[in-house]
Amino acid sequence: MKPSIVLYKSIPTDLHQRLAQHFTVNSFDGLTPDNQPELLAALQQAEGLIGSGGKIDQDFLQLAPNLRAASTISVGYDNFDVEALSQRGIALMHTPTVLTETVADTMMALMLSTARRVVELAERVKAGEWQESIGDDWFGVDVHHKTIGILGMGRIGMALAQRAHFGFSMPVLYTSRRPHEAAEQRFGARHCSLDTLLAEADFLCITLPMTEQTYHMIGREQLAKMKSSAILINAGRGPVVDEQALIAALQDGTIHAAGLDVFEQEPLPVDSPLLTLRNVVAVPHIGSATHETRYNMAACAVDNLINALTGTVKENCVNPQVLITH
């Protein structure tokens, strides 16, 4: 008899069929067991869980007594209680490699569109405001040869540094827990303290995950240390930046502008002051949102779950210590 799993996000048909070759697949649209008795029943039998979003905590895990593996179609996993999963011996799988290049593309797009005011000026053209040759009140600022400061030199940070260094001749600064030899050799990157990064970067690019240590890592004090001409780009996690402090800094000219793919509350509330600021480019968490990459993420998550439940995991496990007990 095939193991039973719960799939709580729509995936391409061929990937669904791949899962069905190995498991009895119970498909649902999201995780709301209180309103879906069928989902509650499926969770009781499920050995695997695959999807994205939802809060997977101790209370949720009590609904799934037979769960052995959870596979998230994302690189981030802050919606999972990793400690609770590990205590139960449940492997948590994620997709850290397949979205790297696409997220780096998104960050470059935010840098360019924010610096050159692409979104704002496109809307002004559509509104019929372009009636004569433009003046300097429509000008943006250059990206090339400016200093990029990367907060978090992981896979995405490396991909961003590559684009900045080779594509735009940008000096690369970075702050991370330890020096990154490859970044320094390939891109001439310079490891520095957070204070130095804030003081010298023309573009502060945040790629950090959300943890207790990174929560509000960039707040009023840190923003005040940045250049008044600096632009903040966040495609990591929203709560890494104190959003209220950022709004104030953008309103009073402490920093020049911001390009944001992530927010403290998502979707971004319609009454957010961020939506009223011309010096903000806000996009709806599209970092990995291309057809190709989302397919590859789903395929990776499918493989991850198959590997986890068949005992063949070699990578992409958040809590590999539990595999010893499987």
Curated annotation (Swiss-Prot):
What InterPro entries does this protein's entry cite?
D-isomer_2-hydroxyacid_DH, D-isomer_2_OHA_DH_cat_dom, D-isomer_DH_CS, D-isomer_DH_CS1, D-isomer_DH_NAD-bd, Glyo/OHPyrv_Rdtase_B, NAD(P)-bd_dom_sf
Q: Does the keyword Methyltransferase apply?
A: no
> Where is the major localization of this protein?
cytoplasm
Q: Which GO terms describe its molecular function?
A: glyoxylate reductase (NADPH) activity; hydroxypyruvate reductase (NADH) activity; hydroxypyruvate reductase (NADPH) activity; hydroxypyruvate reductase [NAD(P)H] activity; NAD binding
Task: Tell me which residues this entry annotates as catalytic.
Answer: R237, E266, H285 (proton donor)
Top EC class per UniProt? oxidoreductase
Recorded catalytic reaction(s): these are: glycolate + NADP(+) = glyoxylate + NADPH + H(+); (R)-glycerate + NAD(+) = 3-hydroxypyruvate + NADH + H(+); (R)-glycerate + NADP(+) = 3-hydroxypyruvate + NADPH + H(+)
Q: Which PROSITE patterns match?
A: D_2_HYDROXYACID_DH_1, D_2_HYDROXYACID_DH_3
What EC number(s) does its UniProt record assign?
Answer: 1.1.1.79, 1.1.1.81
Gene Ontology cellular component?
cytosol; plasma membrane
Keyword terms of this UniProt record: Cytoplasm, NAD, NADP, Oxidoreductase
What's the short name of a Pfam family annotated to this entry? 2-Hacid_dh_C
Compartment annotation: Cytoplasm
Q: How does it assemble?
A: Homodimer.
Q: Which family does the entry's similarity section mention?
A: Belongs to the D-isomer specific 2-hydroxyacid dehydrogenase family. GhrB subfamily.
Record NCBIfam families: PRK15409.1 (NF011938)
The UniProt function text for this chain reads: Catalyzes the NADPH-dependent reduction of glyoxylate and hydroxypyruvate into glycolate and glycerate, respectively.
Give the protein name, as stated in the record. Answer: Glyoxylate/hydroxypyruvate reductase B
What is the species listed in this Swiss-Prot or TrEMBL entry? Answer: Yersinia pestis
